[in-house]
UniProtKB/Swiss-Prot annotation:
Domain of life assignment: Eukaryota
Bilayer topology annotation: Multi-pass membrane protein
Residue stretches spanning the membrane: 179-199, 357-377
Source species: Ogataea parapolymorpha (strain ATCC 26012 / BCRC 20466 / JCM 22074 / NRRL Y-7560 / DL-1)
Role summary: With PEX32, contributes to tethering of peroxisomes to the endoplasmic reticulum for organelle biogenesis, positioning and segregation.
Protein name from the UniProt record: Peroxisomal membrane protein PEX24
Consequence of gene loss (knockout): Results in severe peroxisomal defects, caused by reduced peroxisome-endoplasmic reticulum contact sites. Leads to defects in peroxisomal matrix protein import, membrane growth, as well as organelle proliferation, positioning and segregation.
Region (Disordered), start-end ranges: 549-569
Length: 569
């Protein structure tokens, strides 16, 4: 950002004294902001870079208001904002926005009052300030977690448009039952968790044996309600457009993956990022902030009324951007906690815990269906909401202390141990399922040295064997892969795919043979080999006899390593 404000009269010729003071104050704020940013660039001060872009919008807004309306005392106070910023709880942008609203003529406008109330809200003051880098990272993270929302959206569209008549009729039947028996609306979510989360995760951990059946061509309609399916021209055209769109998206994604195989690892959700990830975030934040604030600065040119209306719209835009940023942060935290809870409790990571949840959900469904007509649901809903709201009262701790009894009735030690022993018996489960392993092959591709033909150097780790029949090798292209095995990730179906291979610790495999040609790494969830669904990563050495064009044939793998196991940290 240049040190001159974005005004056509920045040269200073023909300006009044208050306007000159205004320009000097704005320049002073800019210089202090830039000096503060440069002094903090080496550490955590990188987060303060958001004020540079925000200051551009504020300068444009102050200029459009008219600096003649501000007094010298106001400019002195604005000059001191950057110094008081780290000591005051009120954000830098909020202070400037309040001064901006004070400079606008007093009129009975509901939008102005609403903006003031939002700025002075104590809950809003406690939230983080506006940061283009943060909001861009939130949108990127949120877009990767919206699969469930999008699948729900398309499911609703399929139900309404009769794309799947059986699904539409099932929805109508379930909705009718829910209207006749309202307590079933509590059963439906539990039933979805049971059939849509628990059972698929169990089948993934314990796959069923598929019988060898000769495949035959499907005859007739796939559903008995096929005559209800709509096959008009509009529907066929919509399906054709969706198919072309999906193919185009796959082609674009494949091209992006070819170009950004290694750089994609900088996409992370953590706040404490490395230098490469931080560079990626700053670069994307700068490009997005330029687009956003360019639209803010050009808004005056598009509006017919360049006075007070344009200023209010700009202030409202900044406030809404900050609220949207904090809203997306809360949504991401909530979705992350939900995913972690589902993975810990319902993915059969711990067989006993997930099995207990399975039986508890079945018992809850049966009890609700059988005893549902006799349960006072209205009283339960009323009391539940009242209790939840009262528990959020600021003086709840004082009230709860008064309600607690002064002396607690404690059981004797013998009775206490007996109760614990009976409770532990009720929760005992025996899981006798044999361990099952899935193999993931990672090929260690090596190059032959030109000077010493007997020496091979590591080239990369790849998911493709890169043999003579490989498409890339036929086209005389380099294989796709990663130079370091620590960057290799598990597939998404492996559960917690955030753990990389390099984060596993090796332990000896006493039962394995010493003459195998694969290096096997087994991923267990709890640190030992009792998990029924472990991951085996097989690393097979592939040696290339030519380093330039990969024209010659592969030599046989002579890599016979000691088998090791790797378990999750």
């Amino acid at each position: 950002m240049s040190n001159s404000p974005p005004s056509s009269s920045s040269s200073g010729k023909g300006l009044s004294i208050p306007r000159k003071l205004a320009l000097n104050a704005i320049n002073e704020i800019q210089n202090r902001s830039n000096d503060y940013l440069l002094s903090k660039r080496g550490g955590k001060g990188l987060e303060e870079g958001r004020k540079r872009a925000a200051l551009a919008a504020v300068i444009s807004t102050v200029s459009s208001v008219g600096a003649d309306r501000l007094t010298k005392a106001d400019f002195d106070e604005l000059r001191d904002l950057s110094e008081q910023e780290s000591h005051d709880k009120v954000h830098f942008m909020d202070k400037l926005t309040n001064k901006l609203l004070d400079a606008i003529p007093r009129r009975s406008d509901e939008s102005m009052d609403e903006l003031r109330k939002r700025l002075e809200d104590r809950h809003r003051v406690e939230q983080p300030g506006l940061s283009i880098k943060r909001i861009s990272r939130n949108f990127k993270t949120l877009s990767s977690k919206m699969d469930l929302v999008f699948s729900l959206q398309y499911s609703i569209i399929h139900v309404i448009s009769w794309d799947k008549p059986s699904l539409t009729l099932t929805f109508l039947i379930l909705y009718t039952w829910g209207c006749l028996m309202p307590y079933l609306f509590l059963v439906y979510p539990v039933f979805y968790v049971l059939t849509g989360v628990l059972i698929p995760n169990y089948l993934y951990r314990h796959p069923l044996a598929k019988p060898d059946i000769i495949p035959t061509r499907a005859r007739g309609d796939s559903s008995i309600f096929g005559f209800l399916r709509t096959e008009n021209a509009w529907e066929l055209d919509r399906q054709r457009i969706l198919l072309e769109r999906s193919r185009t998206l796959e082609r674009i994604l494949s091209q992006e993956l070819e170009l950004s195989t290694i750089s994609s690892r900088t996409s992370t959700d953590s706040e404490d990022e490395g230098s490469s990830s931080l560079f990626y975030e700053v670069f994307t934040a700068d490009s997005k902030s330029n687009l956003v604030f360019k639209a803010v600065l050009e808004e005056d040119e598009e509006t017919t009324e360049k006075g007070r209306t344009g200023v209010v719209d700009k202030v409202k835009l900044l406030i809404n951007m900050r609220d949207l940023q904090n809203l997306t942060s809360d949504i991401i935290k909530m979705m992350t906690r939900m995913q972690d809870s589902i993975y810990e409790n319902y993915s059969f990571k711990d067989e006993k815990r997930s099995t207990k949840h399975f039986f508890n959900l079945i018992a809850l469904i049966l009890i609700t269906i059988v005893l549902g007509p006799y349960i006072p649901w209205r009283a339960i809903f009323i009391i539940t909401v009242w209790v939840l709201i009262l528990l959020k009262h600021p003086n709840r701790q004082h009230i709860l202390k008064q309600l607690k009894p002064a002396t607690k009735h404690k059981l004797p030690p013998k009775h206490r141990t007996e109760v614990k022993r009976r409770a532990s018996r009720l929760g005992e489960l025996i899981v006798d399922d044999p361990p099952q392993y899935r193999t993931i092959q990672i090929y260690q591709i090596e190059k032959q040295d030109l000077i010493k033909p007997s020496v091979y150097e590591l080239y990369m780790y790849s998911s493709s064997i890169f043999n003579e029949s490989d498409t890339l090798r036929i086209q005389k292209k380099d294989p796709r892969g990663l130079p370091i095995s620590h960057w290799c990730k598990l597939p998404a179906q492996a559960g917690n795919s955030r753990k990389r291979i390099g984060q596993w610790t090796p332990i000896r495999d006493p039962g394995a043979s010493k003459t195998v040609s694969w290096m096997r790494w087994r991923l267990t969830e709890s640190g030992h080999m009792t998990s029924p669904a472990s991951i085996v990563v097989a690393v097979l050495c592939v040696r290339l006899s030519d380093t330039a064009g990969h024209q010659k044939s592969d030599r046989g793998s002579t890599m016979i390593p000691e088998p090791v196991r790797r378990k999750a940290v």
